[in-house]
Amino acid sequence: MKGDGRAGAHPEPTLKIDNQPLKREGSMTVSFAPVIQKVAPSVVKVFTSTEAKPNASRRGPGLEQFFGEKFRGFEFPDMQGSKPKSGLGSGVIVSPEGYILTNNHVIEGANTVKVVLSPGNEEYAAAVVGVDPKSDVAVLKIDALDLQPIELGNSDQILVGDLVLAIGNPFGVGQTVTMGMVSAKGRSNMGLDYEDFIQTDAAINPGNSGGALVDAEGRLIGVNTAILSQSGGNLGIGFAI
Protein backbone atom coordinates (compact mmCIF):
# COMPACT_ATOMS: atom_id res chain seq x y z
CA MET A 1 0.00 0.00 0.00
CA LYS A 2 1.40 3.40 -0.95
CA GLY A 3 1.18 6.62 1.08
CA ASP A 4 0.68 6.99 4.82
CA GLY A 5 -2.90 8.28 4.83
CA ARG A 6 -2.13 11.17 7.21
CA ALA A 7 -4.01 14.44 6.83
CA GLY A 8 -1.98 17.65 6.68
CA ALA A 9 -1.26 20.59 4.41
CA HIS A 10 -2.24 19.80 0.84
CA PRO A 11 -1.90 21.68 -2.46
CA GLU A 12 -4.85 23.38 -4.11
CA PRO A 13 -6.63 21.01 -6.54
CA THR A 14 -6.41 21.66 -10.25
CA LEU A 15 -9.92 21.12 -11.60
CA LYS A 16 -10.91 20.67 -15.24
CA ILE A 17 -14.36 22.15 -15.78
CA ASP A 18 -16.51 22.13 -18.92
CA ASN A 19 -19.60 24.34 -18.69
CA GLN A 20 -20.68 23.85 -22.30
CA PRO A 21 -24.24 22.53 -22.74
CA LEU A 22 -24.66 18.90 -23.75
CA LYS A 23 -24.99 18.34 -27.50
CA ARG A 24 -28.51 16.92 -27.73
CA GLU A 25 -28.95 16.79 -31.50
CA GLY A 26 -27.23 14.65 -34.11
CA SER A 27 -26.90 11.00 -35.04
CA MET A 28 -27.72 8.35 -32.45
CA THR A 29 -24.81 6.98 -30.44
CA VAL A 30 -24.58 3.19 -30.70
CA SER A 31 -21.73 2.76 -28.22
CA PHE A 32 -20.47 4.63 -25.18
CA ALA A 33 -17.21 2.66 -25.13
CA PRO A 34 -15.07 5.73 -25.98
CA VAL A 35 -16.69 7.67 -23.13
CA ILE A 36 -16.11 4.83 -20.65
CA GLN A 37 -12.49 4.40 -21.75
CA LYS A 38 -11.95 8.08 -20.96
CA VAL A 39 -13.78 8.10 -17.64
CA ALA A 40 -13.04 4.67 -16.11
CA PRO A 41 -9.53 5.50 -14.82
CA SER A 42 -11.03 8.37 -12.81
CA VAL A 43 -13.34 6.12 -10.76
CA VAL A 44 -11.77 4.28 -7.82
CA LYS A 45 -12.69 1.70 -5.21
CA VAL A 46 -12.75 2.88 -1.60
CA PHE A 47 -12.17 0.39 1.21
CA THR A 48 -12.61 1.19 4.89
CA SER A 49 -11.92 -0.52 8.18
CA THR A 50 -13.85 0.43 11.30
CA GLU A 51 -13.60 -0.82 14.85
CA ALA A 52 -16.92 -2.55 15.40
CA LYS A 53 -19.17 -2.00 18.37
CA PRO A 54 -20.64 -5.16 19.91
CA ASN A 55 -24.21 -5.87 18.79
CA ALA A 56 -24.16 -3.05 16.25
CA SER A 57 -27.39 -2.76 14.29
CA ARG A 58 -27.49 -4.20 10.80
CA ARG A 59 -28.84 -2.72 7.61
CA GLY A 60 -32.63 -2.51 7.37
CA PRO A 61 -35.13 -2.01 4.54
CA GLY A 62 -36.31 1.24 3.05
CA LEU A 63 -34.32 4.17 1.71
CA GLU A 64 -30.86 2.67 1.27
CA GLN A 65 -28.77 5.80 1.80
CA PHE A 66 -26.23 3.76 3.77
CA PHE A 67 -25.73 6.43 6.44
CA GLY A 68 -23.56 5.65 9.47
CA GLU A 69 -23.45 2.26 11.14
CA LYS A 70 -26.89 1.27 9.90
CA PHE A 71 -26.52 2.31 6.28
CA ARG A 72 -22.85 2.08 5.35
CA GLY A 73 -22.10 1.90 1.61
CA PHE A 74 -21.62 -1.86 1.79
CA GLU A 75 -20.42 -4.03 4.67
CA PHE A 76 -18.80 -7.40 4.36
CA PRO A 77 -20.48 -9.98 6.62
CA ASP A 78 -19.14 -9.89 10.16
CA MET A 79 -20.13 -12.81 12.33
CA GLN A 80 -18.54 -11.43 15.51
CA GLY A 81 -19.30 -7.86 16.48
CA SER A 82 -15.95 -7.39 18.25
CA LYS A 83 -13.96 -7.69 15.02
CA PRO A 84 -13.21 -4.67 12.81
CA LYS A 85 -15.76 -4.08 10.07
CA SER A 86 -14.68 -3.76 6.46
CA GLY A 87 -16.72 -1.55 4.17
CA LEU A 88 -16.47 -0.45 0.59
CA GLY A 89 -17.67 2.24 -1.75
CA SER A 90 -16.47 4.22 -4.71
CA GLY A 91 -14.83 7.57 -5.39
CA VAL A 92 -13.99 9.93 -8.24
CA ILE A 93 -10.58 11.48 -8.91
CA VAL A 94 -11.15 15.20 -9.56
CA SER A 95 -7.61 16.58 -9.73
CA PRO A 96 -4.11 15.40 -10.70
CA GLU A 97 -2.97 16.24 -7.16
CA GLY A 98 -4.88 13.21 -5.90
CA TYR A 99 -8.11 14.69 -4.58
CA ILE A 100 -11.04 12.26 -4.65
CA LEU A 101 -14.74 12.95 -4.13
CA THR A 102 -16.87 10.36 -2.33
CA ASN A 103 -19.81 10.23 0.06
CA ASN A 104 -19.33 11.07 3.70
CA HIS A 105 -21.31 7.98 4.70
CA VAL A 106 -18.78 5.76 2.90
CA ILE A 107 -15.90 6.83 5.16
CA GLU A 108 -17.72 8.08 8.26
CA GLY A 109 -16.24 6.58 11.42
CA ALA A 110 -13.56 4.64 9.55
CA ASN A 111 -10.18 4.12 11.20
CA THR A 112 -8.42 3.50 7.90
CA VAL A 113 -9.32 4.35 4.31
CA LYS A 114 -7.70 2.78 1.24
CA VAL A 115 -8.16 3.62 -2.41
CA VAL A 116 -7.62 1.17 -5.28
CA LEU A 117 -7.11 2.57 -8.76
CA SER A 118 -8.51 1.19 -11.99
CA PRO A 119 -6.95 -0.26 -14.04
CA GLY A 120 -3.91 -1.75 -12.36
CA ASN A 121 -5.37 -2.21 -8.86
CA GLU A 122 -2.69 0.00 -7.30
CA GLU A 123 -3.54 0.54 -3.64
CA TYR A 124 -2.97 3.75 -1.70
CA ALA A 125 -3.64 4.93 1.83
CA ALA A 126 -6.05 7.84 1.71
CA ALA A 127 -6.26 10.85 4.00
CA VAL A 128 -9.66 12.34 4.73
CA VAL A 129 -9.09 16.05 4.08
CA GLY A 130 -12.66 17.31 4.22
CA VAL A 131 -16.17 16.16 5.11
CA ASP A 132 -19.62 17.73 4.97
CA PRO A 133 -22.14 15.41 6.62
CA LYS A 134 -24.98 17.85 5.90
CA SER A 135 -24.60 17.25 2.15
CA ASP A 136 -23.00 13.77 2.48
CA VAL A 137 -19.79 14.75 0.67
CA ALA A 138 -16.22 13.87 1.62
CA VAL A 139 -12.85 14.62 0.03
CA LEU A 140 -9.97 12.15 0.17
CA LYS A 141 -6.34 12.68 -0.83
CA ILE A 142 -3.81 10.14 -2.08
CA ASP A 143 -0.18 10.60 -3.06
CA ALA A 144 0.06 9.09 -6.53
CA LEU A 145 1.51 9.97 -9.92
CA ASP A 146 -0.08 10.04 -13.37
CA LEU A 147 -3.65 10.18 -12.15
CA GLN A 148 -6.43 10.80 -14.66
CA PRO A 149 -8.93 13.25 -13.14
CA ILE A 150 -12.46 13.39 -14.46
CA GLU A 151 -13.81 16.41 -16.28
CA LEU A 152 -16.43 18.30 -14.30
CA GLY A 153 -19.73 19.16 -15.95
CA ASN A 154 -22.51 21.52 -14.90
CA SER A 155 -25.41 19.69 -13.29
CA ASP A 156 -27.59 22.80 -13.62
CA GLN A 157 -27.62 22.28 -17.39
CA ILE A 158 -28.87 18.69 -17.44
CA LEU A 159 -32.46 18.00 -18.44
CA VAL A 160 -34.90 15.25 -17.56
CA GLY A 161 -34.45 12.67 -20.32
CA ASP A 162 -30.70 13.16 -20.75
CA LEU A 163 -28.75 9.89 -20.89
CA VAL A 164 -26.40 9.26 -17.97
CA LEU A 165 -23.87 6.58 -17.00
CA ALA A 166 -23.26 5.38 -13.44
CA ILE A 167 -19.80 3.99 -12.67
CA GLY A 168 -18.77 2.36 -9.41
CA ASN A 169 -17.96 -0.80 -7.48
CA PRO A 170 -21.30 -2.45 -6.60
CA PHE A 171 -21.07 -5.22 -4.00
CA GLY A 172 -17.30 -5.23 -4.51
CA VAL A 173 -17.51 -7.10 -7.82
CA GLY A 174 -15.28 -4.55 -9.56
CA GLN A 175 -15.79 -1.49 -11.69
CA THR A 176 -19.22 -1.62 -13.30
CA VAL A 177 -21.01 0.72 -15.72
CA THR A 178 -24.78 1.09 -16.00
CA MET A 179 -26.83 3.39 -18.19
CA GLY A 180 -30.09 5.22 -17.69
CA MET A 181 -31.53 8.69 -17.90
CA VAL A 182 -32.19 11.65 -15.69
CA SER A 183 -35.59 10.79 -14.23
CA ALA A 184 -36.07 13.97 -12.20
CA LYS A 185 -34.15 16.92 -10.76
CA GLY A 186 -34.26 18.66 -7.43
CA ARG A 187 -35.37 15.69 -5.35
CA SER A 188 -35.37 16.24 -1.58
CA ASN A 189 -36.76 14.73 1.64
CA MET A 190 -33.84 12.30 1.81
CA GLY A 191 -32.82 13.06 5.38
CA LEU A 192 -30.01 15.53 4.67
CA ASP A 193 -29.81 19.22 5.56
CA TYR A 194 -28.78 20.27 2.06
CA GLU A 195 -30.55 18.43 -0.76
CA ASP A 196 -30.83 18.82 -4.51
CA PHE A 197 -30.66 15.26 -5.82
CA ILE A 198 -30.61 14.03 -9.40
CA GLN A 199 -32.90 11.02 -9.74
CA THR A 200 -31.89 8.36 -12.27
CA ASP A 201 -32.95 4.90 -13.35
CA ALA A 202 -29.34 3.87 -14.02
CA ALA A 203 -28.72 0.85 -11.77
CA ILE A 204 -27.14 1.86 -8.46
CA ASN A 205 -26.43 -0.72 -5.75
CA PRO A 206 -24.54 -0.92 -2.43
CA GLY A 207 -20.89 -0.17 -3.17
CA ASN A 208 -21.80 2.38 -5.85
CA SER A 209 -21.96 5.09 -3.19
CA GLY A 210 -19.41 7.78 -4.01
CA GLY A 211 -19.11 6.72 -7.65
CA ALA A 212 -19.57 8.84 -10.73
CA LEU A 213 -22.73 9.85 -12.54
CA VAL A 214 -21.60 11.25 -15.89
CA ASP A 215 -23.37 12.70 -18.90
CA ALA A 216 -23.14 11.30 -22.43
CA GLU A 217 -19.85 13.14 -22.94
CA GLY A 218 -18.25 11.71 -19.81
CA ARG A 219 -18.45 14.82 -17.65
CA LEU A 220 -19.14 14.41 -13.94
CA ILE A 221 -22.60 15.73 -13.05
CA GLY A 222 -23.19 13.90 -9.78
CA VAL A 223 -21.91 11.53 -7.11
CA ASN A 224 -24.08 8.43 -6.68
CA THR A 225 -25.46 8.44 -3.17
CA ALA A 226 -28.65 6.49 -2.50
CA ILE A 227 -31.35 4.17 -3.79
CA LEU A 228 -34.99 3.82 -2.87
CA SER A 229 -35.51 0.12 -2.22
CA GLN A 230 -37.26 -2.30 0.11
CA SER A 231 -34.89 -5.13 -0.82
CA GLY A 232 -31.56 -3.30 -0.69
CA GLY A 233 -31.06 -3.79 -4.44
CA ASN A 234 -31.71 -1.58 -7.42
CA LEU A 235 -35.33 -0.89 -8.37
CA GLY A 236 -34.62 1.88 -10.85
CA ILE A 237 -34.83 4.76 -8.37
CA GLY A 238 -31.36 6.07 -7.61
CA PHE A 239 -30.12 9.44 -6.43
CA ALA A 240 -26.92 11.42 -6.99
CA ILE A 241 -25.75 14.67 -5.43
Regions found by a protein language model. Name each.
Residues 2-241:
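Serine-dependent protease modules
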